[in-house]
């Protein structure tokens, strides 16, 4: 079923007017939502644990409190802390301070959909999920545009949850460019699948495998890096701007012919079956439980995965090549730590 794009004109009720808003977390999404909402005239406070994010929020001019204090003061509470810490944060500091008629929001449905967080029946639960990272949500807002967003209602205790969700999306600039209504189930499962099978897991595995095939065949690692990784952005930018059609119109006939001939040899029916298995593990909660259990155990799996990835030859080759290419962007690993 096709969904209809909605815009600022479709946001009929200023549901956030007169409400005290608490943004919980001041990371990637937190800093963007809070600053954009403030700039659109809303009353925003920050709830965050002591540390760099707390200090940054105060530096940016926000009244900043502990999570518990911010929850007590607020009518609408948006939880933008990392997925893996939301459950303990909610149970320890948010749940004891909620009141009937409050609204609790999320930018991703993970903890609600998989029932790690259960909100009382007399509290609204909504979602505003921008389809872009926080720095882009903020930058495009400042440029007069925005990032499209999904919105959803999981629990409508007051009858106002949808209006709150849409007005939140408007407040961060998303309604300038388009909103799509969804459900917590749909957003959560599709988002995780996209990340794992295509955008992050699938893409990095494809690049690394291509690099291995070339280097194992005797080609220079530096040249292999350019062919399978460096040029990826050039192709993705074309697809982003105009779909497969623009990309194919922009490349050589040789490249286009090879696209049609060899793409299906790489992404076979077996790969599609593997993708379906990934989706099944998302749908049945296996991935969610594995992720949360690893976090509760001290992240042994995630730590091991990170160490293994850091030692890949393609990473070492790329690090050296990028030193000679300042035009590719920020090389400082600490650049966005305050917002992650």
Curated annotation (Swiss-Prot):
EC number: 1.1.1.86
GO biological process: isoleucine biosynthetic process; L-valine biosynthetic process
Domain KARI C-terminal knotted: start-end pairs: 183-328
Keywords, comma-separated and alphabetical: Amino-acid biosynthesis, Branched-chain amino acid biosynthesis, Magnesium, Metal-binding, NADP, Oxidoreductase
Positions annotated as active site in the UniProt record: 108
Residues reported to bind NADP(+): 26-29, 49, 53, 83-86, 134
Residues that, per the record, bind Mg(2+) 2: 191, 227, 231
Domain (KARI N-terminal Rossmann) ranges: 3-182
Pathway(s) this gene product operates in, as recorded in its UniProt entry: Amino-acid biosynthesis; L-isoleucine biosynthesis; L-isoleucine from 2-oxobutanoate: step 2/4; Amino-acid biosynthesis; L-valine biosynthesis; L-valine from pyruvate: step 2/4
Reactions it catalyzes: (2R)-2,3-dihydroxy-3-methylbutanoate + NADP(+) = (2S)-2-acetolactate + NADPH + H(+); (2R,3R)-2,3-dihydroxy-3-methylpentanoate + NADP(+) = (S)-2-ethyl-2-hydroxy-3-oxobutanoate + NADPH + H(+)
Pfam family, one: KARI_C
Gene Ontology molecular function, alphabetical: ketol-acid reductoisomerase activity; magnesium ion binding; NADP binding
Top-level lineage group: Bacteria
Residues that, per the record, bind substrate: 252
Cofactor list: Mg(2+)
Residues where Mg(2+) 1 binds: 191, 195
PROSITE patterns in the record: KARI_C, KARI_N
Gene Ontology annotations for the cellular component aspect, listed alphabetically: cytosol
Coiled-coil parts of chain: none
Co-factor note (free text): Binds 2 magnesium ions per subunit.
Family: Belongs to the ketol-acid reductoisomerase family.
Protein purpose: Involved in the biosynthesis of branched-chain amino acids (BCAA). Catalyzes an alkyl-migration followed by a ketol-acid reduction of (S)-2-acetolactate (S2AL) to yield (R)-2,3-dihydroxy-isovalerate. In the isomerase reaction, S2AL is rearranged via a Mg-dependent methyl migration to produce 3-hydroxy-3-methyl-2-ketobutyrate (HMKB). In the reductase reaction, this 2-ketoacid undergoes a metal-dependent reduction by NADPH to yield (R)-2,3-dihydroxy-isovalerate.
Protein name: Ketol-acid reductoisomerase (NADP(+))
Source organism phylogeny: Bacteria, Bacillati, Bacillota, Bacilli, Lactobacillales
Gene for this chain: ilvC
């Amino acid at each position: 079923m096709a969904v209809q794009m909605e815009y600022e004109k479709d946001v009929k009720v200023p549901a956030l007017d007169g409400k005290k808003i608490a943004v919980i977390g001041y990371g990637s999404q937190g800093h963007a939502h809070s600053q954009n909402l403030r700039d659109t005239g809303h009353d925003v406070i920050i709830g965050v644990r002591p540390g760099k994010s707390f200090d940054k929020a105060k530096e940016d001019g926000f009244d900043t409190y502990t999570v518990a204090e911010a929850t007590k003061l607020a009518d609408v509470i948006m939880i933008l802390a990392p997925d893996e810490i939301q459950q303990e944060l909610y149970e320890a500091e948010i749940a004891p301070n909620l009141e009937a008629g409050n609204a609790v929001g999320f930018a991703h449905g993970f903890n609600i959909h998989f029932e790690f967080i259960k909100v009382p029946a007399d509290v609204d639960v909504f979602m505003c999920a921008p389809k872009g990272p926080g720095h882009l949500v903020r930058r495009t807002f400042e440029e007069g545009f925005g990032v499209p967003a999904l919105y959803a209602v999981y629990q409508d205790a007051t009858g106002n949850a949808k209006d709150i969700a849409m007005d939140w999306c408007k407040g961060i600039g998303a309604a300038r460019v388009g909103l799509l209504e969804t459900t917590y189930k749909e957003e959560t499962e599709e988002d995780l699948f996209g990340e794992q099978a295509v955008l992050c897991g699938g893409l990095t595995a494809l690049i690394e495998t291509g690099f291995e095939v070339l280097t194992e065949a005797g080609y220079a690692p530096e040249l292999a890096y350019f062919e399978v990784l460096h040029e990826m952005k050039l192709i993705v930018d074309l697809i982003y701007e105009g779909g497969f059609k623009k990309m194919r119109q922009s490349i050589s006939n040789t490249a286009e012919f090879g696209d049609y001939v060899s793409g299906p040899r790489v992404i076979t029916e077996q790969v599609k079956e593997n993708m379906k298995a990934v989706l099944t593990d998302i749908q049945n909660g296996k991935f969610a439980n594995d992720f949360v259990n690893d976090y509760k155990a001290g992240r042994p799996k995630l730590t091991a995965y990170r160490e293994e990835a850091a030692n890949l030859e393609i990473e070492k080759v790329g690090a050296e090549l990028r030193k000679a290419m300042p035009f590719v962007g920020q090389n400082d690993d600490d650049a966005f730590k305050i917002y992650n």
